[in-house]
Amino acid sequence: MPCNCFKSNVHVQEYKDLLVFGYASTIFPNDYQSEHIAEERHTVPCLGDPENRVDRYDCRLLLPSIDVAIKRNGSPSEQCPTEAMEEDMCEEERYLDMYKDIQREQEKEEEEKRRNDQRNAIGFDYGTGKVKARESDSEDEPFEPPEGIKFPVGLELPSNMKLHHIIEKTASFIVANGTQMEIVIKAKQRNNAEQFGFLEFDHRLNPFYKYLQKLIREKKYIPDLNKRPKKLTKTSRASTSKPAISSSLAAIAAAHGSDSEDSDSDYELHPSLLSGGAKRPVTPEKPGAIGPRKKPVEPEKPPDFTLKPVGDISQRNDVYAALFKNLAHVTRQAAGVEEVKMNVEEAKKEKENDHLDDPEYREWYENFYGRPCPWIGPRPMIPATPDLEPILNSYAEHVAQRGLEAEASLAAREDLQLHFMEPKSPYYSYYHHKVRMHQWRMYQPIEQNLSPLVLNSPAPPSAVSSPGPSSLMSLNLSTPEPPLNRRQRRRLLDSSRLDESITEPGVIDPITMLQIPKSVSTPANLDILKTPISFSLRNDEPRDESSFRFDPDLDETAGPSDTTANFSDISGLFPPPTPPVIPPSTQMQVDRKEKARIFMEKLLQEKKAKKLQEEEERSKLEEETRKKAEKISESLSERKNTGRSDRREEAPKGARSLDEIINNRINSLLSESGFEPVEEMKRTDEDRERKRHRKRSRSRRRSRSCSPRDRSREHKKSRKSGRHHRSRSRSSSRDRHRRNRSRSRDRRR
């Protein structure tokens, strides 16, 4: 009974937070629906078979025929090796996470075991193997000097190899990075004096450290930092305990294909459950098999055996060492000559291999620059960066339209910094490619409109040497080129203004467009051009607005019209091509930019004019004030010189008269406002003090001459007179205040 109570309490505690609630519902039979289902009126015939009726949502209704569902192929299908391999790969990918999780858990268990049983772990042994004695650790190994180095007598050496490795590594680091790093290491390792105490000057190993540092700096000793001290690792322990494994365990491991020979875990999974445990047999693949193929197994290369000398022969003092030292200089000279020859040959090969052999490029270079090409072809093309691409494209188009002189004028301007026009630039070949591309686009419509006579005649050199679509469409030109910013457009306009003298705008000569070679230009070969050529100049015709306007500052209405030529009488020559046309939107943008520039210049000029006007006004005011000051100073100096004596006499009177006028004016204002003048009050106070002083002096004189009774009488009289005087002064001040108040009231009214 108590057990049941305990169990019930436990269940109550488990489901204490669980809450179940619901609502009451009324269930009633649906006679119509039940009758409908009982009579199977909700079913439909399956694929036209009235006897076989199914629900209208049955999936068998989707089949074209019922025979497809009934028909079954009893014969097993042949298994293809590629399909089997695909299935194995799918299975491996399907359960890859499970295998990885198992491996992760196994690694965690091994780490926990290693931590808990690190000191007490003893490998299992059947007693058949030989137990080797444990090797001494490298930390306790005594110091052994490196091969080929003799330390001076009296130099104190480190006690073990561990300390020697620390000193060696520190010395090589200081030699490589400078002596300042020694201060940094000393500051960081100030608490580790046991290992880095040799950095102190008074330490016993500091001379050894300095001597080792000197050897490394002079390259007499090169330490092998990759060489690690010998430590007793798990692999070495496992190798020592390999003979202790019995033959039965080796047979079991070989049968199951286990790869872990030195595993100490007793709780491993069966090898068949591991991902890499079971090795599949290697089956030869068929040559016509379709599907994934296995990676071919590469044969292992045998290790390279290199024989190293036991010691440095140059450090010996015998006969062979002397012979070696004498022959070392000769061998070094021969090796140096061979290295120089090899370097020269490699440089020549690199220069030859750097440029690609392209005869079309050489022909175009010779026709464009007028000199033979110094290379066999262009360098490998490196596309420009996104920020350089629009600038390079715009200048390449400008050079393609204007020619070599435009390129020379642009390259001479250092403010533009057009480094891609230099042959040393990595984008030089890409720049030439863009120039050829724009030339080909320019001459393509001309070639399409040529007459048969002109097509039979030799073509212009630029058209012949211009690249065709086969050689120029290697790059993706479908993407639109980004527009130029304000600074780039301004630079392009400035460069076009500088080059206006090169080609006159609006004048097109068909003979120069054809560029007849010298062999054709002789009089004997010019039978085609015997017919007369008539030219007509039209000055009254309006200028064609669709043509490209090179200078936006020119007025469209002013100036004579362009020179035109009538080629109606020429037989065999095509009409002159139209000038390059730019869209109206671009022309409007250029006009707006020019108007904005003119407007900004006007604003700047107005500001400058205002500043100049303000400066002039300031200078005028300064001049006037300076002149007034000079006049005043002159008048004062004259007065001082002429009437210095008269001024001394009249100055106090004039000053007194001015002071009296000012004081009277102030007193009148104060009296009008209802206040007593300050000066009058001061004067009355002074007068009173004087009177009192006089009375006291008189009373003293009398007291000296009179008796004590007379003195008392005089004292009483003076008291009475003082009281009377005070009462009179009070009454007079009251009357004065009343008068002032009445005056102020009258003024307000």
Swiss-Prot record:
Entry keyword Repeat: yes
Family matches, as PANTHER family: SPLICING FACTOR SUPPRESSOR OF WHITE APRICOT, SPLICING FACTOR, SUPPRESSOR OF WHITE-APRICOT HOMOLOG
Name of the protein in question: Protein SWAP
Dry CEEERYL: annotated segments: 8-124
Positions of SURP motif repeats: 166-209, 391-431
Gene this protein is translated from: swp-1
Biased composition (Basic and acidic residues): 105-118, 538-552, 608-659, 679-689
InterPro entries given in the database record: Surp (IPR000061), SWAP (IPR040397), SWAP/Surp_sf (IPR035967), SWAP_N_domain (IPR019147)
Pfam family, one: DRY_EERY
Alphabetical UniProt keywords: mRNA processing, mRNA splicing, Repeat, RNA-binding, Transcription, Transcription regulation
Signal peptide: none
Ranges annotated as biased composition (Low complexity): 458-478
Bias-annotated ranges (Polar residues): 560-569
SUPFAM superfamilies in the cross-refs: Surp module (SWAP domain)
Organism: Caenorhabditis elegans
